[in-house]
């Protein structure tokens, strides 16, 4: 039996056990998958105890992705560039860190929603860890431009500069975006979690695809997008399922059917 878990704080809300158990049933693997509340100031002790129990791997969510990045002794290219880890695989003495967030987002946008990113103008709201985790996979799709916008403009400037070698990036503060329209808007801020709407011009949502990394309810960002005539609106549930599938394949080598799981969760 494979032994897996997800670490976070808080963690009760996590859908990961449900998703991973559905994948296991599909593919014929026997797994255990727990939710583990790690102390904010002692992530390492929690994961080390889990590893000592014979763990095969685990997922990491807020606020421990940077801690997991530091804890891993081997990193994939995605994890190195993202600077954070959301999936770890244990192989003997190897603690291999991966970041599946960005690839999960791309798969949801392209496979589930049917949106191509090539030659598109993409606006990303926020310049924190969530944005850093998705930028490299987005730029690999060869969009025309990726605009990073953040309340603290210096963070957006730094992120745009750091990723400029992978594609065409630029930055603006949230209330000074100099674009009248874009093709895709991705909300990677915590505004929806806090019940707030990002401070950006209403007109920019007109006829755009609007995607919120948050999931589970009609977020304030999604309501804002609907009011302002977005062409298509989605939450991040598909991304959650797709990134979980990549983690499952990373651990087991088996590729699960995400559409069935996503359909079950949408019911």
From Swiss-Prot:
The lineage of its organism: Bacteria, Pseudomonadati, Pseudomonadota, Gammaproteobacteria, Candidatus Pseudothioglobaceae. Pathway: Metabolic intermediate biosynthesis; chorismate biosynthesis; chorismate from D-erythrose 4-phosphate and phosphoenolpyruvate: step 4/7. This is Shikimate dehydrogenase (NADP(+)). Its EC number is 1.1.1.25. Involved in the biosynthesis of the chorismate, which leads to the biosynthesis of aromatic amino acids. Catalyzes the reversible NADPH linked reduction of 3-dehydroshikimate (DHSA) to yield shikimate (SA). It catalyses: shikimate + NADP(+) = 3-dehydroshikimate + NADPH + H(+). NCBIfam families: aroE, PRK00258.1-2. The active site is at 65 (proton acceptor). NADP(+) binds at residues 126-130, 150-155, 213, 236. Shikimate binds at residues 14-16, 61, 86, 101, 215. The gene is aroE. Belongs to the shikimate dehydrogenase family. It comes from the Bacteria. GO terms for molecular function: NADP binding; shikimate 3-dehydrogenase (NADP+) activity. Keywords: Amino-acid biosynthesis, Aromatic amino acid biosynthesis, NADP, Oxidoreductase. Homodimer. It is an enzyme of class 1 (oxidoreductase). One of its GO terms (biological process) is aromatic amino acid family biosynthetic process. InterPro entries: Aminoacid_DH-like_N_sf, NAD(P)-bd_dom_sf, SDH_C, Shikimate_DH, Shikimate_DH-bd_N, Shikimate_DH_fam, Shikm_DH/Glu-tRNA_Rdtase. One of its GO terms (cellular component) is cytosol.
């Amino acid at each position: 039996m494979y032994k897996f878990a997800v670490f976070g704080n808080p963690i009760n809300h996590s859908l990961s056990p449900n998703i991973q158990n559905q994948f296991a049933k599909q593919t014929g693997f026997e797994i255990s998958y727990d939710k583990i509340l790690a102390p904010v100031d002692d992530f390492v002790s929690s994961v080390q105890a889990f590893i000592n129990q014979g763990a095969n791997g685990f997922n990491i969510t807020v606020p421990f992705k940077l801690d997991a990045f530091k804890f891993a002794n081997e990193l994939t290219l995605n994890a190195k560039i993202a600077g954070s880890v959301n999936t770890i695989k244990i192989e003997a003495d190897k603690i291999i860190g991966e970041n599946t967030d960005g690839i999960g987002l791309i798969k949801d946008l392209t496979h589930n929603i049917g949106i191509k990113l090539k030659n598109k103008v993409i606006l990303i709201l926020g310049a924190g860890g969530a944005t850093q985790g998705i930028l490299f996979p987005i730029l690999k799709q060869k969009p025309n431009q990726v605009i990073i916008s953040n309340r603290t403009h210096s963070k957006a400037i730094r992120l745009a500069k750091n990723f400029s070698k992978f594609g065409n990036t630029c930055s603006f503060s949230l209330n000074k975006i100099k674009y009248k329209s874009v093709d895709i808007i991705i909300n990677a801020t915590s505004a929806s979690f806090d019940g707030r709407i990002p401070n950006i011009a209403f007109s920019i949502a007109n006829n755009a695809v609007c995607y919120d990394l948050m999931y589970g309810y009609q977020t304030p960002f999604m309501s804002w997008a609907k009011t302002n005539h977005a062409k298509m609106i989605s939450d991040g549930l598909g991304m959650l399922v797709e990134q979980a599938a990549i983690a499952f394949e990373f651990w087991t080598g088996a590729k699960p059917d995400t559409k069935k799981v996503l359909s079950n969760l949408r019911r």
